Structures are given as C-alpha cells and as structure tokens.
Amino acid sequence: LRYFAHRGLHRFQAEMWSEDEWKHELDWLLKKRFNMFMLRIGGEDIFPLAFPDICDFAEGDAGNPERHGFDDRTPISTLEERSQLRGAICKMAKERDLIQPVDCGTMTHWYSRTPQSFIDSEKPTFLSQTTSIYADKCGLVWDIRDDRNLENYFRITKAYVDNFGHDGLFHTIGLAERLFSADRAENLELKKYTYRRISEFLKKQYPASKLLVGSWDFSMFWHNDEVSALLDELNPEQCIIFDYTSDTLDEKTNFENWSVVGRFPYIFGIFHAYEPSNGVRGDYERIERRMKTAAEDPYCKGFVTWQELSHGDSFMLEYTAANAWQPVGNSRAELLPRYCTARFGKLARMFERIYNELYPVTSLFVWGGDKENEANNFFNDYTYDQISTLI
C-alpha cells in the first residue's frame, strides 16, 4: 500500500494521522499480510537534513500566500513535526519488518517541492517544460544532465537513508506528468536518459539495491513500443517496473502490451481511483483477466495498490490483500460473501445483494488516462461518459 499527500477528510488522508493512528494502520497492514508500504507526504522535511547549512524547518512553516492550488504546500503541521512523525513511522515499520522504498532521482513533484532557500542558494538549473503543470520554480525538475543537480538529488536520498534507514529498495517517478519538447522523439530521449542516469548513479551509491520504476508516466504519456524500447536500456537485475496502473480503462496501453510479460521484472498493481473518488467502484472482470496474466508470469514479482486516498473502498483493500498472496479462489464473486459476513454481520446477505445489484453501474467507474488529450488527463473521470451511453 501507499499513502498519499492529498488533503481532505481525516479518514482518507494519511498526512493528517497521528503517531497512534499510524501504529494502528501498520498493525492492520500486518494483519492483512501486506509487507511493503510507501509514505508519500512530501519531501520538504528532508531538505533541512540534507542541506542543514541552507534550509531549516522553520522556512516551510509559513507557507507562501502567493502560491495557489498545487503550488500551495502550506503544511498542516510544522516541518519539524512532520520529520519527527516520519521517523516514528519508519521506526514502527522497521519493527514490523515492513519494506519501505526510498525515493531517488528526479523526485520534485506537486507534493514534493524545492524550498525557496535552496533555489536562492544553490541556483539549480531546471529542465524547461512545454507544459504549465508544476511550472512554479519550486515545482520544476532540476536538470540532472548537470552532475551537481544529480548529486544534490541523491543528497536528499542519502539524508533519508541516514536518518530513517532503507531496505535496499529505491523508487523513482522519472519525469512523470511532464513534457519538455514539442518533438515526441526528443521528449522521449530525455525521459529515457533520466531513467538511465538515475539507475546508474544509484548502482554506484548502493550497489546491491533494486530500483522500482514507477509506471504512471507510461500509462499516460508513452506508447507501448516506447516502453519496450526503454526496457532494452534498463538492467533487469536492478530495475523492476512498478506498475500500479494495471487496472486502467485503456485496453491498448497497459502492462500486457509493454513487453514486460515473460521478459522483464514487474509488479502488478491497482490504482483504482483518483483522490476525489471515494465510493465503491471498479471493473473486477477486467482486473481478474489481467491479473491471471500476471499470476502465471514468473516475471511478476508482487501486487500493489496505489489509491490516491487511503480508505475509500474497503472491499478493494480486502480484495488486494487476498489476491496479493493467492490469486485463485479470491475473485470478486468468491470474496464478496466472506467480506460482507465479516463486515456487516447479520446484515451480510442484504449488503451482498446491494453490492451485486449495483455492480453493473459501479463496474463502469474505472479510472484511465486520456491518451488523445494527454495534457488534460489529470483528475478526469470518464465514468459519466460511459453511463450516458446507457441512458
């Protein structure tokens, strides 16, 4: 499981949980036999640890009233409190033998901004974007063709490792959600170069490590043959494709067509929903068809769920927990009666009937990137377009 930095109702948003609530959550992970989790609450609190002579915790506490939307990262708590909570969570996770991947490389994103003090002092060169998303300087990616920028990114990783530990597993998003050239081939070459540069530098710093390569950008911006070409340039002994988009609505661009099956290590995963979508949803027939492919493939190394909110659809969490270890005998049809009995007790059969009667509608709620209008594929949900065809 992974826990994200969106903000909203307390139940759904891990950034708002206390240490005691995190203890309860990590114990729940063990109960459900999950063995890995990712904490995605931003990296601003790592900068004072990585660059103590430049950045301090107090800088991030005031926020910036001139920035709005994604650019406004006004903290819910102080950065120092966040850092202390991160340390407590990592310690509890280690005590429970949970794997914790560590971010590396071009990690700047909407939820992980560069402090203004670092920009003013270090003056990193940035990659120029052709899209406006995250275009504020604090959200731009440093140009890692410059050795100094790459080394500084890895100073953040080292600070995390030194303060919170690591299990030999690292993670990169590459240049996800961004375009840097109007020329598709030029844009692709830059993205491929970035993956190579990160993996090669990581190999030097942590020789025995593994690198999870996030699939988010593949699902939205890459063509199948482009993903396949990237695999030719990555080391399968080091890299694992971290595909948390296996349930996408898109039948053309998904792991089955990337040439990973039977060829390159990958993890099968369910994204399930964008942050605003907190209801029952999902096309389980689509998931189970693709899951069968992964379950029969020795190159598939695991199962992950990467929802943008933490406890939106409780059935999907139970479904993931069951199928991650045994993808036989745990189909939606087989699991639903057990789930309803455990969750609803005497009302189990009534809720089972409700779930089944609503399924023809809830199965239409499937996330998916808009490949035809790539710049518009964030937080769009095409469910209503599908439902309108039935009316």
Sequence positions of predicted segments:
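An acidic-aromatic substrate-binding cleft motif
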Residues: 1-45
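Catalytic-core regions of glycoside hydrolase
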Residues: 8-9, 35-65, 71-355, 359
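Compositionally biased, low-structure terminal segments
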Residues: 29, 58, 307, 379-380
